[in-house]
Structures are given as structure tokens and as C-alpha cells.
A protein has these predicted regions:
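A structural signal for small-residue-enriched, beta-sheet-centric alpha/beta enzyme cores
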Residues: 40-48
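Beta-strand elements within well-structured catalytic alpha/beta cores of enzymes
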Residues: 32-40
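Flexible, D/E/H-enriched segments
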Residues: 1-19, 27-30, 48-142
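Catalytic-core regions built around general acid/base machinery
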Residues: 24
């Protein structure tokens, strides 16, 4: 997804793309194990007068939203990312593709957020679906 050349896609558009990916995967004739990655920088701005900007609170709230309220994240306007978290933070909308592909209910099993000496916040979140847990329980019982 291109977020470099404006206009950037909205979070809602990316979230809905993820839902379409979920539908495509579920329509497959075979039982598949699928891993979906969402990538992109967290809060950061590497140029201009605000170079070096990192907004840890914005990042943590975004990670919270991925687990608990992705619909609210999908409604964040692109200009909010730019204003509150730096012009490169628009990359976060790409994480919403992953989240849309996971469906409504997820379990957060891992989270990491770090602001290194560089000017880009780093984050990672691992979410698992209820379907994954059901498959895992079925394999363990067999």
C-alpha cells in the first residue's frame, strides 16, 4: 500500500481491504494456516522542523486499538496521524490491513514498543484469532 504518494489511503479503506483478504482466505477450498503481517513505522518524522518527533502515547494508544477497537482506529483521519505522530506515521494505516484480515475477536499474545536512539518508534504486536485457538485445541485433543 502506497502511503508515500498523496493522497494516502484512509485507515477505513485499509481496514476494509483486510476484511476482503479475510473473505478471500476463508473462501479457499482447503484448510489453510495463514499468517498476516502489518508493517510500517510507528510515530516518527525524519525531516523538517519537527524532525525527531516521536509520540509514545499515540503509539501505545494505537497498539491498544489494534487489540480492542480497530473500528475506532479505522476512523482516524490521515491528517491526525501527520499532526499527532509525525508525517511518516501515516504508515500505521497499513497495520489496519492486517487487523481487518483477523476478524472481530483477537487475543493479544505479545506486544513490544521501544523508542531507540534513532528518531523512529518501533513496535510489534502479535494477535491471534479465536479460529486459531480452536484449531490449536483440536490438534492437542487429537
Amino acid at each position: 500500500v502506497n502511503v508515500i504518494q498523496y493522497p494516502a489511503p484512509t485507515g477505513n479503506r485499509c481496514y476494509n481491504l483486510g476484511k476482503a483478504i479475510k473473505t478471500a482466505v476463508e473462501s479457499w477450498d482447503e484448510d489453510l494456516n495463514v499468517v498476516i503481517f502489518g508493517t510500517g513505522g510507528m510515530s516518527h518524522q525524519i525531516q523538517g522542523p519537527r524532525a525527531g518527533l516521536v509520540n509514545k502515547e499515540f503509539d501505545i494508544a494505537f497498539l491498544d486499538g489494534l487489540s480492542k477497537d480497530p473500528e475506532a482506529l479505522a476512523k482516524i483521519p490521515p491528517m491526525t496521524y501527520l499532526r499527532d505522530a509525525g508525517n511518516e506515521a501515516i504508515e500505521l494505516v497499513m497495520w489496519l490491513i492486517m487487523r481487518g484480515a483477523l476478524g472481530d475477536k483477537v487475543d493479544e499474545v505479545y506486544r513490544f514498543h521501544h523508542v531507540p536512539a534513532s528518531s523512529t518508534a518501533v513496535g510489534c504486536i502479535i494477535l491471534e484469532t479465536g479460529e486459531y485457538h480452536a484449531q490449536k485445541a483440536g490438534r492437542a485433543a487429537a
